[in-house]
Curated annotation (Swiss-Prot):
NCBIfam families: proB. This is Glutamate 5-kinase. The keyword Cytoplasm applies. PANTHER family: GLUTAMATE 5-KINASE, ISOPENTENYL PHOSPHATE KINASE. Pathway: Amino-acid biosynthesis; L-proline biosynthesis; L-glutamate 5-semialdehyde from L-glutamate: step 1/2. Residues 278-355 form the PUA domain. Its EC number is 2.7.2.11. SUPFAM superfamilies: Carbamate kinase-like, PUA domain-like.
Length: 368
């Protein structure tokens, strides 16, 4: 709970069983309005909030009159196409009365595996957050295949948390935490209040959920916890069907907290520092000083570009004496970087023919 009170950036994952009534397949409107009040309160506290929401297939299933049983892939994709519109509209209508602008961001797990797409999604999310909007991230189930079959929005939520450098990830689910065994089958199962480290013994305890709507079971939640905590993000599993579920969590509702393993930004920089570089950038004395002062690398300070690399690839950064200063992720291709080296940021559009980003390597994508 202390992690949530001090958090600067919070990602909240909402399972489809919370959003959609099991019997009628209708949206749980009153519950969503209470969640919107939670989001508005967090925003007033100065926190950034990102929502990762399941529910498009469940909503579309009801609209199309499809059965509640497992659907063939094509029908799942069709249901998602119908449900995504309804899902986006529901969040917009719930948050607009609080003066909050919402934005729909559709992603798949593949977006995290390709560095260029990863940087694109990260830049979009950061821009939306900077403009005060609340991104509603949803799996793009209309084109995804493995994600639909295995229901991996828990891991997707963890990836979003890692991407935006969140301090806390909250998985609102139909279970109230992590248990030593499946509580539906074992009356002696005990819930953990806090897990400091995910050990092989903890992994062996993971079972599967019993919901007919949410596909993500305890195994995917544990995978999400491993991903998030390794990146310095604390994670909570909490029963979310109650009204104002985040307020309930803060008030001490039953849950399991997974302890973050370090600071998110430090973890990210370690990840960047461990990458194999694809090219080399040599900078002048002024740029070297700017980097040591915590600034981004601008094209004007670049004196030489070496290698054949793409956007998002890791580059070594050398000082004017040839000494390695660090490394970072390039926001431009090698060809673009060579064209821009030595030029001011306000000349980028004239040189490339489009308005690119001011920094060649942003300080958040750099490890010195």
């Amino acid at each position: 709970m202390a992690a949530l009170s001090t958090a600067r950036r919070v990602v909240i994952k909402i399972g489809s069983a919370l959003l959609v009534d099991r019997t009628s397949s209708a949206l749980r409107q009153e519950w969503l309005l209470s969640l919107a009040e939670d989001v508005a309160r967090l925003k007033k506290q100065g926190k950034d909030v990102i929502l990762v929401s399941s529910g498009s297939i469940a909503l579309g299933r009801g609209a199309l009159g499809l059965p509640r049983k497992d659907l063939p892939l094509e029908q799942s994709q069709a249901a998602a196409a119908v449900g995504q519109i309804r899902l986006a509209r529901a969040y917009e209508e719930a948050l607009a009365p609080h003066g909050i602008t919402t934005a729909q961001v559709l992603v798949t797990l593949e977006d995290s595996e390709n560095r260029r797409r990863y940087l694109n999604s990260r830049a979009t999310l950061e821009t939306l957050i900077g403009l005060g909007a609340v991104p509603i991230v949803n799996e793009n189930d209309t084109i995804a295949t493995d994600e639909i079959r295995y229901g991996d929005n828990d891991r997707l939520a963890a990836q979003v948390a890692v991407t935006v450098g969140a301090d806390v990830l909250i998985l609102l689910s139909d279970v109230d935490g992590f248990y030593s065994a499946n509580p539906a089958l074992d009356p002696d199962a005990k819930r953990f209040d806090r897990i400091e480290q995910i050990t092989p013994e903890i992994e062996a305890m993971a079972g599967d959920g019993v919901s007919g709507l949410s596909k993500g079971g305890m195994i995917t939640k544990l995978l999400a916890a491993k991903m998030a905590t390794a990146a310095g993000c604390a994670m909570a599993i909490s029963e979310g069907s109650v009204m104002s579920p985040v307020s309930a969590l803060e008030a001490g509702a039953a849950s399991t907290w997974f302890t973050a393993q370090g600071d998110p930004q430090v973890a990210r920089k370690r990840w960047i520092a461990a990458m194999k570089t694809r090219g080399v950038i040599t900078v002048d004395e002024g740029a070297a000083k700017a980097l040591h002062n915590g600034n981004s690398l601008l094209p004007a300070g670049v004196r030489h570009v070496e290698g054949d690399f793409g956007r998002g690839d890791p580059l070594a950064i050398l000082g004017p004496d040839g000494r390695k200063l660090g490394q970072g992720l390039s926001r431009y291709t090698a060809e673009e970087a060579r064209a821009l080296q030595g030029h001011r940021s306000d000349e980028i559009e004239a040189i490339l023919g489009y308005a690119g980003r001011a920094a060649l390597i942003h300080r958040d994508d750099m490890a010195l």
